[in-house]
């Protein structure tokens, strides 16, 4: 039986999570995208704690006209990098959450690199 697009993503996510884990020294940058918004958070898996988080939804309250396109996703990446720098986080492990490294997911990664995070 053929898997749906979301079921296939969930299966990829499980395979990736077996290999990728965040620590206190190098936490995990997780990206989630919906049809309307892009969410990013930095997680320490050993403690089970979210260190910083932001999204186009949160940024849209401050900036009028922020859309969930590649430009908005890049702003999310820049903002998550700024917030991480405030908490003295320089290096992260990128978790694409089962999505293809393309489009909005790639834009978040590029924005985070531009903001100073090291993958």
From Swiss-Prot:
Organism domain of life: Bacteria
BP GO terms, sorted: translation
Keyword RNA-binding: yes
GO cellular component, one term: cytosolic large ribosomal subunit
Keywords (A to Z) from UniProt: Ribonucleoprotein, Ribosomal protein, RNA-binding, rRNA-binding
Keyword Manganese annotated: no
GO MF: 5S rRNA binding; structural constituent of ribosome
InterPro entries: Ribosomal_uL18_bac-type (IPR004389), Ribosomal_uL18_bac/euk (IPR005484)
NCBIfam families, alphabetized: L18_bact
Subunit structure comment from the entry: Part of the 50S ribosomal subunit; part of the 5S rRNA/L5/L18/L25 subcomplex. Contacts the 5S and 23S rRNAs.
Family to which this protein belongs: Belongs to the universal ribosomal protein uL18 family.
Biological role stated in the UniProt entry: This is one of the proteins that bind and probably mediate the attachment of the 5S RNA into the large ribosomal subunit, where it forms part of the central protuberance.
Name used for this protein in its record: Large ribosomal subunit protein uL18
Annotated source species: Desulfovibrio desulfuricans (strain ATCC 27774 / DSM 6949 / MB)
Species classification: Bacteria, Pseudomonadati, Thermodesulfobacteriota, Desulfovibrionia, Desulfovibrionales
Gene: rplR
